[in-house]
């Protein structure tokens, strides 16, 4: 190659490098400028929220699960809502899903960490729990089977069960990965293989397991914090029905609002050991909000509400044995109502049966994040939007993601 051509190519390479560096520098400047603008806007929005006068406005929260209690915390923290104007209606602990193992992912756990940071006596304690003992790591024979599964088209897996696929490597059913899938996704050996494959795409480790006792301790700290803030926790109380108003009859959901709540409260007659009940009708005024864990009370209230409007989801998709909701069916995504249904003026949903674009619906992260999403959108606090557009992956990115998923499962000691 002549010297002149070499010099020309060198000049072109240098120019290309300088152009790329200039482009990266410009992009970083714009990114920093946007971050500063966002920070300034956040400060202004926070000041506006702090200066609000809520007057006689009230918040009614249905259910005393982790997500319901978290909603009360976010009302106080993000919206500076007076605790004395918050009412939480709940049944017993088990009925509200507070009795089992709680799984926490370290990915996207900012909301969970921030919530725990608001509770005296929690904080680091929650994140120093040892991983549940008894499980084993993935073996060398398990990883190739997982790789083949992730690379197989889903349409070819519908007729197979998880046990069929791993019949040659039964060791996987003794690992922490399988325990995690049972806790987070409710999978069994005879579960559909395509559903198991979809679950693997959602796993981002590492995960921590909170025992039922540790979960109860977190719930206790939440209630203790809320009582100090003046929140009225009405236990042994059930919201049996609600009355909805739809300001637009064309089915779009515009103007959807809760107008009345019907409450049944249990009393105990000490002298006779008989149960007595008090029934109450609550009228919601303009500005009042209603936040519902639609899985509480076996989903009976959600079923009644869903019959009134299409925007409130399809609880029938989750009905299992004994006509009870099965929260361990996370992939009925479109059957879940958004944390704030389209057009809703004062109704929000939290918990495993509400819809967020990201996250495993049976983790502590999801419970806390759904509560924050519903509260901030209903109260226009601006902390976070309820959802984002789904991103499409190219074939190359898909293979890279497969590799990352398998590697993360192995590194997570699952």
Mark where each language-model region is.
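Extreme N-terminal leader/targeting segments of oxidoreductases
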Residues: 2-59, 77-85, 399-413
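Conserved flavin/dinucleotide-binding core of flavoenzymes
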Residues: 27-45, 281, 285-286, 296, ...
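Glycine-rich active-site loop/strand segments that organize a redox cofactor
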Residues: 33-44, 91-111, 153, 185, ...
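Short hydrophobic core segments
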Residues: 62, 239, 282-295
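Glycine-rich FAD pyrophosphate-binding loop
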Residues: 76-98
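Dinucleotide-binding Rossmann-like beta1-alpha1 core, especially the glycine-rich loop
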Residues: 99-152
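Active-site/ligand-binding neighborhood in enzyme catalytic cores
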Residues: 147-257, 262-273, 277
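Flavin (primarily FAD) binding-site architecture
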Residues: 269-276, 292-303
């Amino acid at each position: 190659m002549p010297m002149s051509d070499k010099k020309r190519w060198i000049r072109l390479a240098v120019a290309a490098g300088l152009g790329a560096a200039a482009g990266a520098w410009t992009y970083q400047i714009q990114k920093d400028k946007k971050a500063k603008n966002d920070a300034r806007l956040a400060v202004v929005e926070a000041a506006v929220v702090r200066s609000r006068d809520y007057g006689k406005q009230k918040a009614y929260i249905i259910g005393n699960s982790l997500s319901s209690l978290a909603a009360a915390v976010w009302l106080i923290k993000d919206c500076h809502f007076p605790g004395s104007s918050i009412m939480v209606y709940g049944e017993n602990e088990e009925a509200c899903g507070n009795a089992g193992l709680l799984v926490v992912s370290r990915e996207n756990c900012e909301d969970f960490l921030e919530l725990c940071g608001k509770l005296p006596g929690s904080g680091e304690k929650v994140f120093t729990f040892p991983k549940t003992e008894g499980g084993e790591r993935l073996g060398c024979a398990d990883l190739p089977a997982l790789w083949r599964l992730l690379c197989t088209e889903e349409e070819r897996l519908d007729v197979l069960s998880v046990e069929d696929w791993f019949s040659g490597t039964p060791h996987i059913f003794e690992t922490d990965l399988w325990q995690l899938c049972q806790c987070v996704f409710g999978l069994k050996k005879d579960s559909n293989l395509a559903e198991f494959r979809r679950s693997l795409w959602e796993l981002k480790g590492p995960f921590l397991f909170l025992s039922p006792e540790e979960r109860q301790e977190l719930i206790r700290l939440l209630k203790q914090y809320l009582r100090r803030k003046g929140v009225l926790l009405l236990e042994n109380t059930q919201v049996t029905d609600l009355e909805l108003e739809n300001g637009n009859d064309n089915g779009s959901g515009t103007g959807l609002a809760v107008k009345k709540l019907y409450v049944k409260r249990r009393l105990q007659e000490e002298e006779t050991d008989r149960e007595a009940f008090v029934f109450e009708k609550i009228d919601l005024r303009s500005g009042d909000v209603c936040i519902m864990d639609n899985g509480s009370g076996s989903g009976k209230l959600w079923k009644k509400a869903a019959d009134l409007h299409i925007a409130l989801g399809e609880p029938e998709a989750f009905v299992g044995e004994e006509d009870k909701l099965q929260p361990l069916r996370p992939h009925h995504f479109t059957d879940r109502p958004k944390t704030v249904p389209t057009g809703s003026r004062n109704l929000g949903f939290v918990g495993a049966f509400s819809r967020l674009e990201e996250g495993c619906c049976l983790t502590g992260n999801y419970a806390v994040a759904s509560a924050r999403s519903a509260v901030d959108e209903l109260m226009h606090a601006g902390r976070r939007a309820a959802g984002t557009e789904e991103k499409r992956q190219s074939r190359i990115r898909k293979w890279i993601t497969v590799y990352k998923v398998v590697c993360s499962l192995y590194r997570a000691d699952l």
